[in-house]
């Protein structure tokens, strides 16, 4: 069953959040928004604060989900992360990383696949 893109994205973010919690991450924020943009998930992984972009798709018809994160989108995430770091005054306390989680949904049933790409991009 197909839903609108916003519903698909929200469902994928929930799957991704559960996945990283089960992988030992601590979720600090979900859907952090500011005037510069949005970050889907901000989490702590040991001594890293990780800014995670989640991309959810039905299959690979239009390429892998991570291919949708072009330089412009990366730059927007980076600037939003900078604002978060300043706002929380954590610039000297942690390392920082940008990860991507790809969620591929199955159109026939509730199965899905998930792929975590650590250090997916650097600016």
UniProtKB/Swiss-Prot annotation:
What is the scientific name of the source organism? Clostridium botulinum (strain 657 / Type Ba4)
Instruction: Tell me which family the UniProt entry assigns to this protein.
Output: Belongs to the UPF0102 family.
Query: One GO MF term, please?
Result: nucleic acid binding
Q: Which CDD domains does the UniProt record give?
A: PoNe_Nuclease (cd20736)
Give TM segment ranges. Answer: none
Q: Which PANTHER family match?
A: UPF0102 PROTEIN YRAN
Tell me the domain of life: Bacteria
What protein name does the entry list? UPF0102 protein CLJ_B2665
